[in-house]
Amino acid sequence: MQKITVMKKSILLFFILIINITGYSQNEDYQTETKTHIFWQPDRKLTTADFQRDVRDVPLSSIKECGDYGYCVVGAYGLYHVIDVTKGKYKPGEYQEKLYIAPAFEKPQSVIIKPDSLGLEIQQTLFDIDELCARTIRYKLDHYYERFNDSTIKTNPDNPYTMWFNTIFDECEQYYGKMKWAYLNEVVIKKGDYEHWKNTVDTTLDYLKEYATTPEDCYRFVKNKPIEKKMVKAKYLAPSLYKK
C-alpha cells in the first residue's frame, strides 16, 4: 500500500513538472510577425506574398527605375527601437533598463512591379543589412564605456541605454545607410557581384551572432507595449552627440 502511494506521488510530480515545462515553452513562443509587419528572424525569409502594395499605386519614378535598372522588387524597411525602464518608485539597485531593437519589413508599402527572383534576394540582403545595424548597436552599447569613461564624460552605470542609445543609433544608421546605397549602386545599377555582397553580409552576421535580434525583441513591437509588468517606456533619451 505504501509503495502504491509513493508511486502515485511520483506520477503526480511528473505531470506537474510536464505542465510547468509546457507553460514555460508557451510563454517563450513569442509572435514575431503581424498582418502588416515582418520583424527580422533568421528563419523567416521574404517571399513574393509579403510584397502587398498594389502596383497601380506605385509612383512613376519607381516604374522608370524598374525599366532603366531592373529594380522591380522594392521593399520598405524600418529599424524599430524602444527602451523600457523600471516603473514608479524604486530602491537603489532596483532600476533596470531593457532595450528592444528589431528590423521591420512593411508589407503594405512593399511592391513587386515585375517578378524577379534575384530582385527578391536583393531585398532579403537589404533586410539583413538592417539586422547588421541592430547587432552593431547592441555590440557598441556593450563596449561604449571603454571609449567614453574618462575625465570629461562620466558614465552613469545605472542608465547606459537612455544615456547613449541615440548617439550610437545615429552612428550606425549613417554607416549602414551608406552601405545600403553602395550595395544597391553596385548590384542593381552596375550589375556587380551580388554573391560577394551576400557573402560579406552573411559572414558579418555570423561574427555578430551573439547580438542577434531575438523573438522577444520582435514581440515587444507586435505587442506595442512593455512585455514586463513592472516596466514602462522611457520618456527621455539623452540627445545624440552627433546632433548640435
How would you describe each model-predicted region?
Residues 26-114, 127, 131, 135-244:
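Extended, composition-driven regions rather than compact fold-specific motifs
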Residues 1-30:
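Bacterial Sec-dependent N-terminal signal peptides
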